[in-house]
Amino acid sequence: MENLGRKLVLAKQGKDLTRLMKDEAWQVRCEVAKNENNEVLDVLVKDENWMVRSEVLKHRRDSDLDILVNDKDHWIRSEVAEIGRDKDLDVLVKDKEFTVVLEVLKHNRKKDIDFLKNSDDFIIQSKLRKLNV
C-alpha cells in the first residue's frame, strides 16, 4: 500500500491521476484537482469534500461554475460569486447565506443593490449603508 506522501508526490507530478482521483484521502484528491486534466476535473467537481471542489473551481471552467453555483456548501457558492459571472451573480444574489450575498455585492452591480435594498438581513443592510446606496 502506498503511503500518503508518495501519492501526493505522484499527483503533484500529474502522474496516475485517474487512479488517484478516486483515492480515499481528500488531500490526494485536492492535489489531483490542481492538474488541468478535464477528464479528472469532470469527476472531482462532484467530490464529497468541499476543499476538493474548491480546487476544481480554481480552474474557472464554465462547466464547473454551472454546477457549483448551486453547491450545498456556502463557501463554494461564495467562491463562485467571487469569480463574478453575471449569470451566477443573478442566482447568488438570492442566496439565503449572507456570506454569499456579501460576495455578490463586491461586484457593485446596480440591479443587485436595488434587489437587496428590501432585504431584512441586518448585515446586508449594513453593507449597503457602507456602499452609500
Protein language model features and the residues they cover:
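Alpha-helical scaffold segments
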Residues: M1-V133
